[in-house]
Design a protein with these regions (language model features):
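FNR-like FAD-binding dehydrogenase module
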Residues: 1-200
C-alpha cells in the first residue's frame, strides 16, 4: 500500500529523475534484457539502440513521480501504455520482472547513500500501485476485445491473403483469420502485435 510517506519520498526523487532518469532506465533495460531474455521480444530493439525506449520510460517514470498525488493527470499516457501493452500481450506475471529490475537499477545507479532502504521501499510501493493500475486497465481492454463481435483474447492465427505494392518502399499486407471467423472492427493507427512464422 502506498502511504503518504511513500508519496513524499517518491516526489523528493523528482530532481534526481530529471537529472539522471535516462541513465537509470538504460541501466534498467541492460539488466532486464540480459537476465530475462524471454521479455526481449516485447521491446523494439531499434528503439533500444537509438535510446528512444529508455528516454520514453524515463519520461514516464518522471511523469508518474510528479503526478503521484493526481494520477488522473496521467490518463493519456496511461492509455497509450495500456494499448501498447495489450498489442504485445503483456501479462500480469511479467510485471514483477520489471519491478525487481527497476528497483535494482535505482539502487545501483543512485548508490546506497541516495537509494536508501526507505527510498527503495517507497519506489517498490509506488511501482506496485502503477502495476496494479496498468494490469486492471489492460484486463478491461482484453475483456472488451474478447466480448466484441469477431473479437478474441490472446494470440490468433492469421494468414496473408494478399500483398499489394503501394510504392517502391511500401507494401500492404491483407490478413485473414486462419479459423475463417469474423474479425472485430479496427481503427487506422491502432497498435497490433505480430508474431511471424516465415518458411525457410
Amino acid at each position: 500500500m502506498l502511504s503518504a510517506q511513500h508519496r513524499d519520498i517518491v516526489k523528493a526523487t523528482v530532481p534526481l529523475l530529471e537529472a539522471g532518469g535516462e541513465a537509470l532506465t538504460r541501466h534498467f533495460y541492460g539488466t532486464m534484457l540480459a537476465e530475462y531474455p524471454e521479455v526481449r521480444p516485447l521491446f523494439n530493439q531499434a528503439h533500444q539502440a537509438s535510446g528512444a525506449q529508455p528516454r520514453a520510460l524515463a519520461n514516464g517514470i518522471l511523469q508518474y513521480a510528479r503526478h503521484i498525488d493526481r494520477l488522473e493527470a496521467l490518463g493519456p499516457l496511461v492509455g497509450q501504455i495500456v494499448q501498447k501493452h495489450v498489442s504485445l500481450q503483456v501479462l500480469p506475471e511479467q510485471y514483477p520482472i520489471v519491478g525487481s529490475c527497476l528497483l535494482r537499477a535505482i539502487r545501483e545507479v543512485l548508490g546506497p547513500d541516495i537509494a536508501t532502504d526507505a527510498v527503495i521501499e517507497a519506489w517498490g510501493a509506488a511501482y506496485q500501485q502503477l502495476a496494479d493500475l496498468l494490469i486492471g486497465a489492460e484486463e478491461d481492454v482484453y475483456a472488451a476485445a474478447a466480448a466484441r463481435p469477431g473479437g478474441w483474447r490472446g494470440a490468433r492465427r492469421f494468414q496473408i491473403a494478399r500483398k499489394v505494392p503501394e510504392s517502391a518502399e511500401i507494401t500492404s499486407f491483407y490478413l485473414k483469420p486462419a479459423d475463417g471467423g469474423p474479425v472485430m472492427a479496427f481503427q487506422p493507427g491502432q497498435y497490433i502485435g505480430l508474431k511471424l512464422e516465415i518458411d525457410g
